[in-house]
Amino acid sequence: MIYHTLQYVLPWAEAGILDVDANNDVVKALGKDTFAPGALNMAKKGSKIAAVPVDGWTQMVVYRKDLFENADLAPPTSYANIVAAVEKLSKQNGMFGFVAATKTDENFMSQVLEHVLLANGVNIVKKGGIKKQGKKLKEALEFYKVIAKASPPGELYWKQSRALYFAGKTPMIIWSPFIMDELAGLRDSAPPTINSDPTSPELASKTGFITNFSGPSNKKGAAWADVRYFGITADADTDEAKQFIMYSMDEGYTSTLSIAPEGKFPVRRGNSSDPEAFTKAWSKLPVGVDRKAPLSDLYDPDVINNIVAGLDTANRWGVKEGELSRASKVIKSQFINRITRLYIDDQIDVDEAVDMINKSLAKFK
């Protein structure tokens, strides 16, 4: 049995390394409807689930709930809502409306862009090849330019976005959940600077998280997720492996998640007796480095539920098509980052950007 990342599920299933039937049996025994749909969909091989989802995390729009409420703004669940907030909150008290990733050679920009493009239904691959881009990509790039123009000048990545949010200089960033303990002043190497006390939970109490947001061409939206799986292999002692997974995903599931709660969201929310049992237990697990506190002490129940809900619509380019490898090569080449930056910097227009991306994509057929 192997604990592995999403990228190996379908290739290993196709190669016969995973015992798809055994893994599917475990999911059925635990209760398919107790798992986050997104985590299951990404592991689908035909009508079966090729590996058992264990845990995951989703990228998040991190935002100042207090500023949104004071300005009578809707939460940042869509391009339109984010643009409205940028327009209203930019320059307010010296604030930048957003801190978008603009450093083209940083994986952080690739990750943020994929999330933004997925939100509008953009997919760069299809089964057996590359997908030509059009209106959806154009809309996504236009949106990204708005948030980039509302950002400080320079080469921006995770470091600046976190620092500016912690200093109260921006109402919105996109980040991973590993920011959650830092927001609450539990990590001395990355303290909030919104007030004079670096251990204060004030910023955490004013922060909301959105994992799933949408563009105009994809009303249901999407969440960018990193999900991990248990895979029973073809040469495993099947009965022993099944028993281990059944225990780890039921009686022992809270212990499984406790290894790193802020990076291990429960993909299995509960069981037949309580559909939210594991979400509740997870929220009470201590997080932090220099100090510890449970997430439920730091964040309201609606915030916790928003975080976990992202796994319902979890997605990544190439997963459903069995083309994750091709999509990864495209992402690692970073040409989408570079062309997007040319557009942000007004060196090309949006139609030229779409055309250049299509020409570059064609090299990966």
Indicate residue ranges for each PLM-predicted region.
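Short helix-loop capping/hinge motifs at secondary-structure junctions, enriched
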Residues: 66-76, 92, 123, 150, ...
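Short helix-initiation/N-cap motifs at beta->coil->alpha
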Residues: 79-83, 154-167
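Extracytoplasmic "Venus flytrap"/periplasmic binding protein-like
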Residues: 1-35, 66-77, 170-172, 187-193, ...
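Hinge/lid segment of periplasmic solute-binding proteins
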Residues: 5-58, 83, 109, 198-211
